């Protein structure tokens, strides 16, 4: 669903910024 898509975007954004996914 939409939440899953947003979660993926947030994870990718964190990875691009060099931050480890917090989940």
UniProtKB/Swiss-Prot annotation:
Q: In which tissues is it expressed?
A: Expressed by the skin glands.
Could you name the Gene Ontology cellular component terms for this entry? extracellular region
Major location, coarse class? secreted
Domain of life, per lineage: Eukaryota
Which biological processes are named by the entry's GO terms? defense response
Q: What keywords were assigned to this record?
A: Amphibian defense peptide, Antimicrobial, Secreted
**Compartments (UniProt record):** Secreted
Q: Which family, according to the similarity comment?
A: Belongs to the gastrin/cholecystokinin family.
Functionally, this protein is described as follows: Antimicrobial peptide.
What is the name of this protein? Caerulein precursor fragment R6
Which organism encodes this protein? Xenopus ruwenzoriensis
């Amino acid at each position: 669903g939409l939440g899953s898509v947003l979660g993926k975007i947030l994870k990718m954004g964190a990875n691009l910024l060099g931050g480890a996914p917090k989940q």
